[in-house]
Amino acid sequence: GCGESATGLNKVGQKVNLFVTDPQGPETDQMYKPIPFFMSNRGYGMFMHTSAPVTCDFGATYIGLNKMFMGDENLDLFVFFGEPKDILDEYTDLVGKPGMPPLWSFGTWMSRITYFSEKEGYDVAANIRKNKYPCDVIHFDTGWFDVDWQCDYKFSENRFQNPQQMLKDLKSQGFHVCLWQLPYFTPKNRYFPELIKKDMYVKNGNGELPYEDVVLDFSNPE
């Protein structure tokens, strides 16, 4: 349980921090997608209904003793009992059941950090098909913008001469294309001044900018 992590699926002996952060690689115990839910082979599962940071200590401090710390004024817990499939069924009855992803998403994805140009994308696709490797997705990571890692949702005009045609060509070869995106904008990003001016960024509890970068507020009707 507890969401995406590069650590072992069995959490016994681990201390897990459930808070969205950039893990800076798989060598840390931080995570992009924490989920405040876990199951035990002792026949129970627990969902922590909070958006606050949570720490679950599964015997890391004291063997055989589970502890939980929640940064919230209220403790709102749901406890489920039964077989794992029954626990998952009850949990998803509560929070919602996921839809089945398309079949191609379970196929092979080809990527690295990072393909910087249209030519690289074409070359990778050609080599895959030439060598008859099964592949469904080509993923362009952090380098498809003008400045690496600074997402502005626009292909670099210097390195991607005709991205629309590239997408069509790759589709005709049987590839889906995935583009790395992140809704944060550094002060050097061309959209940063506009987001500040239009008040379209996520604020902290004091109504202030919590970090140097801004995170796009998708709840803003504008």
Name each model feature, range by range.
Residues 1-102, 112-113, 118-119, 125-130:
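Catalytic and substrate-binding clefts that recognize carbohydrates or anionic sugar/phosphate headgroups
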Residues 99-222:
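Aromatic-lined carbohydrate-binding/catalytic grooves of carbohydrate-active enzymes
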